[in-house]
């Protein structure tokens, strides 16, 4: 609880660092001739990252190869979390897949070596199933860094029973994409570049499918968050005011996973209707056309305690949020950048810092100043992107 007369200030990034990032972004847009934060309609921009030797379509002409040793292992998520916390004072968190049941049930042969779906292509599908079908017909698919290393495409590929090829992954920060099977992905890429295209054997394919199913579902990722942060209690508030109207991938996936794991224990401060299966609105207006995350939760999870987002900035709305926070054992902040002022207001109103678990889910990494502030405070932070190329 804030001391009498004191004013709590939630950790924030340096203005100078933020300004520098904006300048770099503007320079990139100028060079690309596009106002988008990442190249859109420019598949050539991303395809150039993959060796021309791997742009092979027909799988029938290729030999089979065992890419991974029989005893290949990846670090446990909780061990990676502890190592990251020791280094930066925060835990790594990545996108997750809300519907793991979509993983193909068999390792059938496929006609294509590399998927023809390339990052940067304009999105032209009206059906997610149609979009994923091309991945289902291929053994490998290109997936690159965009604004950050973490993209939903990696997961769409993996849960299609396909292996993503991620150029330059070996140069990324050790905690970027911490939850993906990075060692296996880098091993596969190295062998393809050194020995040429080949079809992965059943062991290799099964490893990636099993890893994704066990560790990359939204429920599995939520279990990691609960364990790493030590979340306990019968009432856990999920705070993200903007999510009710605008998608933030990491916040949405985390909320989905927590509700899949803990059910009605999770109380959204502001209900996110498009995540519930009785939503009747147009999901295609949402980010990514709503593919993969809309209408995935049973409507029975709708919380009667959630507040009206339209009233959030009124005096009455702020009082209601404080009352809800006081009634909860833990507060998970799904989009810290978008809710930082609300966090400050709640702490200054008497909610203990230690009750907050905050998620930094944007492409913008926390700078040294922010990390130092986080280390000094009592809130727990999860971070999606880390320093590096």
Residue ranges and their predicted role:
Residues 62, 107-109, 136-138, 160, ...:
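Residue-level preference for short coil/turn positions at secondary-structure junctions
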Residues 39, 43-44, 104-119, 231-246, ...:
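Short hydrophobic beta-strand segments
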Residues 2-15:
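Compositionally biased, charge-rich terminal segments
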């Amino acid at each position: 609880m804030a001391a009498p007369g004191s004013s709590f200030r939630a950790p924030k990034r340096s203005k100078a660092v933020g300004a520098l990032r904006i300048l770099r972004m503007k320079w990139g847009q100028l060079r690309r001739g596009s106002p988008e934060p990442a190249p859109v309609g420019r598949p050539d921009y991303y395809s150039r990252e993959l060796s021309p030797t791997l742009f092979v379509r027909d799988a029938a002409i290729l030999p089979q190869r065992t890419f991974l040793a029989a005893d290949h292992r990846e670090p446990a998520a909780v061990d990676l979390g502890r190592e990251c916390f020791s280094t930066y004072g925060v835990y790594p968190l990545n996108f997750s897949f809300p519907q793991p049941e979509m993983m193909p049930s068999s390792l059938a042969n496929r006609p294509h070596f590399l998927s023809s779906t390339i990052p940067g292509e304009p999105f032209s599908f009206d059906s997610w199933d149609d979009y994923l079908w091309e991945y289902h017909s291929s053994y490998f698919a290109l997936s690159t860094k965009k604004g950050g290393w973490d993209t939903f495409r990696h997961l769409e590929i993996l849960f299609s029973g396909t292996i993503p090829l991620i150029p330059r992954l070996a140069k990324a920060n050790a905690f970027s994409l911490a939850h993906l099977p990075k060692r296996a992905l880098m091993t596969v890429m190295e062998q393809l570049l050194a020995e040429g295209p080949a079809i992965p054997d059943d062991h290799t394919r099964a490893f990636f499918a099993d890893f994704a199913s066990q560790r990359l579902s939204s429920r599995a990722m939520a279990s990691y968050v609960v364990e790493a942060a030590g979340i306990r209690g019968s009432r856990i508030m999920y705070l993200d005011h903007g999510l009710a109207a605008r998608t933030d991938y990491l916040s949405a996936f985390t909320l989905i996973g927590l509700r899949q794991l803990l059910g009605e224990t999770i109380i959204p401060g502001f209900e996110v209707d498009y995540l519930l299966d009785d939503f009747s609105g147009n999901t295609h207006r949402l980010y990514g056309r709503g593919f993969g995350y809309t209408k995935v939760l049973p409507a029975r999870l709708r919380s009667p305690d959630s507040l009206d987002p339209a009233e959030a900035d009124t005096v009455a709305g702020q009082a209601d949020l404080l009352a809800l926070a006081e009634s909860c054992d833990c507060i998970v902040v799904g989009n810290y950048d978008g809710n930082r002022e609300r966090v400050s207001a709640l702490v200054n109103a008497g909610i203990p810092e230690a009750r907050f678990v905050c998620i930094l889910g944007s492409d913008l990494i926390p700078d040294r100043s922010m990390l130092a502030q986080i280390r000094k405070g009592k809130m727990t932070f999860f971070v999606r992107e880390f320093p590096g190329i």
